[in-house]
């Protein structure tokens, strides 16, 4: 395994551990999710360029589009939660509450 692939897998794992560790605040969770998406993007670009799969060359761009949409929805949710409750705790996101 090449060194850069190992580094990207390590970055993904660290970001995943950050999501699991810092899940009390929404902003920390969003930052860790963005780190995961960035490492997935770099891994996908490296895999496609290494194996010369021309048919999959649009996949990293599609991943970036979904990542931007996820960030936009997450930030809109963060603004709404912080405006309504005054903080960004994930425990305020109880959607089953009547």
Curated annotation (Swiss-Prot):
Catalytic reaction equation(s): a ubiquinone + NADH + 5 H(+)(in) = a ubiquinol + NAD(+) + 4 H(+)(out)
Enzyme class: translocase
Annotated keywords: Electron transport, Membrane, Mitochondrion, Mitochondrion inner membrane, NAD, Respiratory chain, Translocase, Transmembrane, Transmembrane helix, Transport, Ubiquinone
Alphabetical list of Gene3D superfamilies matching this protein: 1.10.287.3510
Transmembrane segments: 1-21, 28-48, 61-81
Cellular localization per UniProt: Mitochondrion inner membrane
GO biological process: ATP synthesis coupled electron transport
E.C. number(s) listed in UniProt: 7.1.1.2
GO cellular component labels: mitochondrial inner membrane; respiratory chain complex I
Claim: ATP-binding is one of the keywords in the record: no
Single GO MF annotation: NADH dehydrogenase (ubiquinone) activity
Family matches, as InterPro entries: NADH_UbQ_OxRdtase_chain4L/K, NUOK/Mnh_C1-like
Similarity section: Belongs to the complex I subunit 4L family.
Record's function text: Core subunit of the mitochondrial membrane respiratory chain NADH dehydrogenase (Complex I) which catalyzes electron transfer from NADH through the respiratory chain, using ubiquinone as an electron acceptor. Part of the enzyme membrane arm which is embedded in the lipid bilayer and involved in proton translocation.
Subunit annotation: Core subunit of respiratory chain NADH dehydrogenase (Complex I) which is composed of 45 different subunits.
Protein name: NADH-ubiquinone oxidoreductase chain 4L
Protein's gene: MT-ND4L
């Amino acid at each position: 395994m090449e060194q850069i692939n190992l580094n990207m897998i390590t970055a993904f794992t660290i970001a995943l551990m950050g999501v699991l560790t810092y899940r009390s605040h929404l902003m920390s969770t969003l930052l860790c999710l963005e780190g995961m998406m960035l490492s997935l993007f770099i891994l996908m670009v490296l895999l496609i360029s290494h194996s010369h799969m021309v048919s999959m060359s649009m996949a990293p761009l599609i991943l970036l589009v979904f990542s931007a949409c996820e960030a936009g929805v997450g930030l809109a949710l963060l603004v709404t939660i912080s405006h309504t409750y005054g903080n960004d705790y994930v425990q305020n996101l109880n959607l089953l509450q009547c």
